[in-house]
Amino acid sequence: MSVVDEETRRKILEDWESNPMRKPRVGKVTVNIGVGESGDRLQKAYELLQELTGQKPVYTRAKQTNPSFGIRRGQPIGVKVDLRREQAIEFLDWTLDAVDRELHESQFDEFGNVCFGLEEHIALEGVEYDPEIGIFGMDIAVTLERPGFRVMRRRRCRRPVPRRHRLTKEEGIVFMEEEFDVEVLP
């Protein structure tokens, strides 16, 4: 039982078959660990993310001062890393296994992108608990795009991508169900 009705699904799949430039792909996967404080715990999150992804993370900084949480504006409070191409697809496949390949319709935005979280990094297959590091949760954001989206990001001759070439929520759901064998729950 899918969230997208069969008629809409059929139209979307026919559209992708007739024009390969309309078939979506994974643009990037962003993995974020929000620690909420700087110091030793943030450094451990940095090392964990580097170990899980094989890439060097960047620190995310506080946007504003909040004395009740003990953070100042500009202070590093989290780490994130962007994965692209094959590395992104492999990591996404690995993390989807940790959530039993189930996503909710509310996790998709209007442009077909999807975000989900892991409460504990040890839910990932092959990752063991290390008392030195502790347990961290993480957010995984998947950005879907069609071929040709570079037009709106490139430096020269930048142009907007028309509404008809952007992804919809339904297309994002169908793509995740078809490519990653995900069950989308209402």
From Swiss-Prot:
GO terms for cellular component: ribonucleoprotein complex; ribosome. Gene3D superfamilies: 3.30.1440.10. Keywords: Ribonucleoprotein, Ribosomal protein, RNA-binding, rRNA-binding, tRNA-binding. One of its GO terms (biological process) is translation. One of its GO terms (molecular function) is rRNA binding. PROSITE patterns: RIBOSOMAL_L5. Pfam families: Ribosomal_L5, Ribosomal_L5_C. The keyword Ribonucleoprotein applies. The keyword RNA-binding applies. NCBIfam families: PRK04219.1. PANTHER family: 60S RIBOSOMAL PROTEIN L11-RELATED (PTHR11994). Part of the 50S ribosomal subunit; contacts the 5S rRNA and probably tRNA. Forms a bridge to the 30S subunit in the 70S ribosome. Belongs to the universal ribosomal protein uL5 family. This is one of the proteins that bind and probably mediate the attachment of the 5S RNA into the large ribosomal subunit, where it forms part of the central protuberance. In the 70S ribosome it contacts protein S13 of the 30S subunit (bridge B1b), connecting the 2 subunits; this bridge is implicated in subunit movement. May contact the P site tRNA; the 5S rRNA and some of its associated proteins might help stabilize positioning of ribosome-bound tRNAs. This is Large ribosomal subunit protein uL5. The lineage of its organism: Archaea, Methanobacteriati, Methanobacteriota, Methanomada group, Methanopyri. The gene is rpl5.
